[in-house]
């Protein structure tokens, strides 16, 4: 309480995820989300997110996966920022290479599954990918000419059917847009194989 008044804040988180079948062997999962805090008559730390993921299974052991993501932050708290790099989808650029209040990411990946239950321990696959994205500050307008693009390959290791753990991926990405003082090759490993 300050000067007899009460400062109140309302925290809001709302979203919807919808699967959309497009026919045999392919579908889209679309998501819209808003998170924010309303206080003193304005929205603070407000983040609007739109995502869509597409999967097309060409054959039993071959699939195409793509995604698009757009996020816009408004009056973000100092400790909150939108980051883009190898850790969240732009696989040819270092961790947290780009930051700002607006993020756009487009990815496409062709996957080939090579072997199932090798020694009853893991499954093996490979993928080729292209990622393109950027992050703009609140003062900048979204400009597709700013997009940074990377291409690369991935080794996909899936756990066996008895394990509750997900798979592991090892990515080798090459940034097509040269950045001052930054190498163009990025090697990364992680547990995000989901489509």
Protein language model regions, located:
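C-terminal transmembrane beta-barrel domains of outer membrane proteins
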Residues: 2-195
């Amino acid at each position: 309480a300050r000067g007899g008044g009460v400062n109140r804040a309302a925290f809001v988180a709302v979203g919807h995820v919808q699967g959309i079948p497009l026919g045999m062997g392919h579908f889209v999962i679309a998501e819209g989300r808003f998170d924010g805090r309303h206080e003193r008559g304005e929205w603070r730390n407000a983040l609007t997110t739109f995502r869509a993921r597409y999967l097309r299974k060409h054959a039993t052991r071959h699939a195409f996966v793509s995604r698009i993501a757009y996020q816009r932050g408004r009056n973000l708290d100092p400790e909150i920022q939108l980051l883009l790099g190898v850790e969240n989808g732009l696989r040819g650029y270092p961790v947290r290479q780009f930051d700002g209040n607006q993020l756009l990411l487009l990815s496409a990946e062709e996957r080939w599954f090579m072997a199932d239950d090798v020694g009853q321990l893991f499954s093996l696959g490979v993928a080729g990918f292209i990622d393109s994205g950027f992050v703009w500050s609140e003062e900048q307008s979204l400009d597709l000419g700013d997009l940074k693009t990377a291409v690369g390959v991935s080794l996909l290791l899936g756990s066996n059917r008895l394990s509750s753990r997900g798979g592991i991926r090892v990515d080798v990405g090459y940034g097509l847009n040269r950045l001052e003082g930054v190498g163009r090759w990025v090697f990364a490993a992680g547990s995000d194989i989901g489509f």
